[in-house]
Amino acid sequence: IIMSITNITKADVNISSYETKNGIKVLFSKSDNIPMIDIKITFDAGSNRDGDTKGLSMLTHSLLDEGTSVRKSEEIASIFESNGSIFNTSVNKDRSSISLRSLTQAKYLNPSLKMFLEILSDSSFPNNEVNLQKKRTISTIIEDQSDPSEIASNLFFKEIYGDHPYSHPSIGYADSVKKISRKNIKDFYDKNINAKNASIAIVSSLSKKEVIAIAEKISKSLDKSKKKVITKQTKTISKKEKYIFKNFNSE
């Protein structure tokens, strides 16, 4: 079932490393303190993959749990909440992640994991949810425009990285988010949220055998033949020292 298994021991933490049938690298650390499981899937799908549609990765990830072909956002939220599970997504300039935290008892874990797998394989991005999330995102961007720390951070990255994909804020710009279509989102999901673009980390009180079974289910849900990985963008960045000043009105 598993292509390779190695063990790494450091500071009393034992980490098992192996690959699923379709080649996803999995790291597992056993923790017997609490009967829980933490699953984190990391993708090479940060905002550096946005291309001309700035904010695309973050918008896509924020919509993953807003609907599948058979469930609406309310039902998805209810499944996680009623089983005490937490679903979360995160996007930075380099990477994105999709995670699940659940109790390990079967009556809680099974429905939570089933919902998690459905999101990975079948997010549908309903038009009404896309439009609503775009409005929320634009409101956040507008609010950030009056936040000195956000302004300073955006200026810093723009000055340092120029036209490199790292230069724009991961959330995007109001005008760019406004132009993002459902098709843009679906295409990004299909091209980037896939088995060849993923790695999995799991911390749990479950046995290695049980974790392997879960990893294989995740791997299978991400294995969609039509998905493809985009070649990593690389660009030389010249090192330079600059001081960036921005005046703020105290009124």
Set out the residue ranges of the language-model regions:
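Boundary at the C-terminal end of the N-terminal hydrophobic targeting segment
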Residues: 9-13
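Scaffold signal of the M16-like zinc-metallopeptidase fold and its non-catalytic homologs
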Residues: 66, 144-195, 215, 248
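Solvent-exposed, polar/charged alpha-helical surfaces in well-ordered, non-transmembrane soluble domains
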Residues: 62, 74, 78, 110-114, ...
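M16 family metallopeptidases and their MPP-like homologs
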Residues: 27-29, 34-59, 73-120, 150-175, ...
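Short acidic/His-enriched helical or mixed secondary-structure segments at domain edges of catalytic enzymes
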Residues: 136-154, 234-251
